[in-house]
């Protein structure tokens, strides 16, 4: 139908805009041309903002947030960290069954805030783990519409987290699945007198 064609064109144009924005962001970050506006933010608010932009495959697919400290603060450019969370959550949704559970955990570890996105999908092979953050690497797990996954999302995540002075890594979620964890500097409450 015409309506479906228009919807497909609209979806494809949004995908293309997102692709160009991600590519420009990675390039600017790696060349040091993107200014990062660090402010102290409530981690829970940033997670909530990212979740507004996420659409699961089905109602059975659940996203759970575990954050022991409601007042957890981190220094970040909130707009960029929202993008990191969106990319990690989109990946988890894309590579897990429609009845799966995705867990976001945020906690403080010494002078860093650790935020992780865990899924119970098939996981990532050990030989792919060292390359998942490389630009244009999509791995062996091809999705139905493989042109949609060109390997920019995780590369952008790494560039953003590194620009914040943090690190990002991937580990196995036992018995199956993957956990992406990134760190940000702890934020402090600023009191203006």
Regions found by a protein language model. Name each.
Residues 153, 157:
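Short alpha-helical Gxxx[C/S/T] motif in the catalytic ATP-binding
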Residues 11-16:
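Short alpha-helical segment of the dimerization/phosphotransfer core of two-component systems
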Residues 31-36, 73-76:
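Conserved micro-motifs of the catalytic ATP-binding
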Residues 124-136:
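Short conserved segment of the HATPase_c
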Residues 37-42, 62-72:
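Conserved catalytic submotifs in the C-terminal HATPase_c
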Residues 92-93:
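Short helix-loop "hinge" at the ATP-lid/N-box region of the Bergerat-fold HATPase_c
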